[in-house]
Amino acid sequence: MTKFLGPIAGFGVTFSTMFKKANTEFYPEEKTPTAPRYHGRHQLNRYADGLEKCIGCELCAWACPADAIFVEGADNTDEERYSPGERYGRVYQINYLRCIGCGLCIEACPTRALTMTNEYEMADDNRAGLIYEKDRLLAPLESGMVDSPHPMAPGTTAEDYYRGTVTGGAAPASQDEPEADDTAGDRP
């Protein structure tokens, strides 16, 4: 008897789901918000004055199981300072054809320079377009930030940056550049 009721019970499940309302998502017209901790596109963060947080240590590249990250560090100079430390990431590439979105690179970063955003629309018809360079990964400049290279904020050290005590604002002009004079004689 149970031999005959088994298939009927299976058809009962199928029959009951036939009359349920379909859960249709109207993507891409209506985009549903992602979870706050969603692993989307990577972002290279900046300090409050615009200097880059990446110190070019290459720990993210070593931690990546898919070998999707390439970092080449370089030394900062007093003339060209990209980060508050001795080094910065001169070349930074993430190959999204290889990235598996695991987030191990985020955990490996000692300065929290690398985070993941909620952006997930990265499709491209060109394979080369899915290799993101540093210019596409850097966080956009906010108000009060100055694009690097520029000197550190006056009176601060690299430790002040790492502790988070540096606030936004442009670094003062160097002594080599003359300051603008607001007198009427300077205007054409």
UniProtKB/Swiss-Prot annotation:
GO biological process: aerobic respiration
Alphabetic keyword roster: 4Fe-4S, Cell membrane, Iron, Iron-sulfur, Membrane, Metal-binding, NAD, Quinone, Repeat, Translocase, Ubiquinone
Signal sequence range: none
SUPFAM superfamilies: 4Fe-4S ferredoxins (SSF54862)
Protein localization: Cell membrane
Reactions catalysed according to its record: a quinone + NADH + 5 H(+)(in) = a quinol + NAD(+) + 4 H(+)(out)
Cofactor(s) demanded: [4Fe-4S] cluster
Cofactor note: Binds 2 [4Fe-4S] clusters per subunit.
Region (Disordered): 144-188
InterPro entries in the record: 4Fe4S_Fe-S-bd, 4Fe4S_Fe_S_CS, NADH_quinone_OxRdtase_chainI
Membrane topology (UniProt): Peripheral membrane protein
Molecular function terms, GO-annotated: 4 iron, 4 sulfur cluster binding; iron ion binding; NADH:ubiquinone reductase (non-electrogenic) activity; quinone binding
Binding of [4Fe-4S] cluster 2, residues: C64, C99, C102, C105
Binding site for [4Fe-4S] cluster 1: C54, C57, C60, C109
Compositional bias per record (Acidic residues), positions renumbered to this chain: 176-188
Family, per entry: Belongs to the complex I 23 kDa subunit family.
Quaternary structure and partners: NDH-1 is composed of 14 different subunits. Subunits NuoA, H, J, K, L, M, N constitute the membrane sector of the complex.
HAMAP family (alphabetical): NDH1_NuoI (MF_01351)
Protein name per the record: NADH-quinone oxidoreductase subunit I
Gene (name only): nuoI
